[in-house]
UniProtKB/Swiss-Prot annotation:
The lineage of its organism: Viruses, Riboviria, Orthornavirae, Negarnaviricota, Haploviricotina. Transmembrane segments: none annotated. The N-terminus is important for viral particle assembly. The oligomerization region is central. The C-terminus part contains binding regions for the RNA-directed RNA polymerase L and the nucleoprotein. InterPro entries: Pprotein_pneumovir. Residues 83-99, 105-122 have a biased composition (Basic and acidic residues). Residues 134-156 are annotated as: Binding to protein M2-1. One of its GO terms (molecular function) is RNA-directed RNA polymerase activity. Constitutively phosphorylated by host. Residues 1-30 are annotated as: Binding to monomeric RNA-free nucleoprotein. Residues 125-131 are annotated as: Binding to host phosphatase PP1. Residues 70-81 have a biased composition (Pro residues). This is Phosphoprotein. The keyword Cell membrane does not apply. It comes from Murine pneumonia virus (strain 15) (MPV).
Length: 295
């Protein structure tokens, strides 16, 4: 302003100053057009000194990258027309830029996070339901017997029924194998469980009929248990016999050195002929003697 001080005084100086300020862009606190509830913030970036006259002033975005690359300006300021008299000196130039930030109406709303937590939106999976057999089923005279049998013979798939009866299974060829005997034992055990269920149903009838049915079913159960025991014993006996045969074969193979020779009937006849003619070694055997042997 020292340049204009001696030339413009009073009203002329004020007019010149107002005209100069009209061409300059200053930030205002009023909201911009089309953007409600906004406030302006001013940041300054220092430009490096111009070394030569041919150097062009870079854009505000490039100037921001030279000084502070982490905070580039969003909108470049308008470039006002400059007269020859108003050109600044070749020194550091301050460039003012405006950053427009949207200010919410409610200040409490800014404290809340933008997106809700994923943990709140996730649906909690319900735990799996386990079905427990009610204790009311074990009521009656045969409750303890039923409970003990279920605990003793409980297994995976014990309730699977077979298409064949006990007699049809026994009539099958090769039914003496161990696997088939075990299958029959499993079927009999499942049959026992069915009998126990029948006992539980029979306890709801009259006293005399209930006692008779219970005695009959318990007797059938005892018979089936005896049959199972006999099958198990026969299986065990066969296993023991097979082990004995295997041990005998192993011991014979260990002691046999090939010196013992067992002659068949034909070998004995030939041995007699050879032994009878041993004294007459010079004479050859007759063909008729050899042909008379029935091979």
């Amino acid at each position: 302003m020292e340049k204009f001080a001696p030339e413009f005084v009073g009203e002329d100086a004020n007019k010149k100053a107002e005209e100069f300020l009209k061409h300059r862009s200053f930030p205002s606190e009023k909201p911009l057009a089309g953007i409600p509830n906004t406030a302006t913030h001013v940041t300054k970036y220092n430009m490096p000194p111009i070394l030569r006259s041919s150097f062009k002033l870079p854009s505000p975005r490039v100037a921001a990258n030279l000084t502070e690359p982490s905070a580039p300006p969003t909108t470049p300021p308008p470039t006002p027309p400059q007269n020859k008299e108003e050109q600044p000196k070749e020194s550091d130039v301050d460039i003012e830029t405006m950053h427009v930030c949207k200010v919410p109406d409610n200040p409490e709303h800014s404290k809340k996070p933008c997106c809700s937590d994923d943990t709140d939106t996730k649906k909690t999976r319900k735990p799996m339901v386990t079905f427990v057999e009610p204790e009311e089923k074990f009521v009656g005279l045969g409750a303890s017997l039923y409970r003990e049998t279920m605990q003793t013979f409980a297994a995976d798939g014990y309730d699977e029924e077979s298409n064949l009866s006990f007699e049809e299974t026994n009539q099958e060829p090769g039914s003496s194998s161990v696997e088939q005997r075990l299958d029959r034992i499993e079927e009999k055990l499942s049959y026992i469980i069915g009998l126990l269920n029948t006992i539980m149903v029979a306890t709801a009838g009259p006293t005399t009929a209930r006692d008779e049915i219970r005695d009959a079913l318990i007797g059938t159960r005892e018979e089936l248990i005896e049959m199972i025991k006999s099958d198990i014993l026969t299986v065990n006996d066969r296993i023991v016999a097979m082990e004995k045969l295997r041990d005998e074969e192993c011991s014979r193979a260990d002691t046999d050195d090939g010196s013992a020779c067992y002659l068949t009937d034909r070998a004995r006849i030939l041995d007699k002929i050879v032994s009878s003619n041993a004294e007459e070694a010079k004479e050859d055997l007759d063909v008729d003697d050899i042909m008379g042997i029935n091979f």
